Amino acid sequence: WGFADFYGSYYSHYGNRNNTGSLQLFTGNLFLNEESALEGTGQYLIMEDIFSAPSDTLLPAGNYRAAETGEPFTFYAGKKFEDNRESIPSGAFIYYIESDPTKSKIAYVTDGTMKINVSSEGIYDIQCNFTLDGKTELKGTFKSELPHFDRFAVTPASASRHRLKLQSPVN
């Protein structure tokens, strides 16, 4: 299961008028509990900055690649930022959530491609071919409906983006 968020021209104050979206995909053993916190074990892929043309509001079909250009059909690779001694993941990354929280970890998508096809019925077929942390290959497929949420009207560019709360912290 998964969903996409639309943030509009999120980087317009930096001169980039392209639209920005995010994508969050989950393996089947992860679910939301009564408090809307993520529970279970599995993988949780987050891609925060996926760029599309100014006329696109849904995640368009096409071939995407990791690049720092902000051009349509690119996404930002994953990075870890330190802010007040707190690690903050950004860009494209994946949580590996294990039953033993000490074994859970984050891996960053440092390179790769993503191919998106959309059927006439609105079914998204997403093929990922990523390199994690500069060495490990990750290939995966998502095929399902993909709800899109419009965050453009409610999220000023200076605000943080929406993420699901994890039941246990992952370092």
State where each predicted segment sits.
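Surface-exposed helix/loop patches within compact recognition domains
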Residues: 13-116, 171
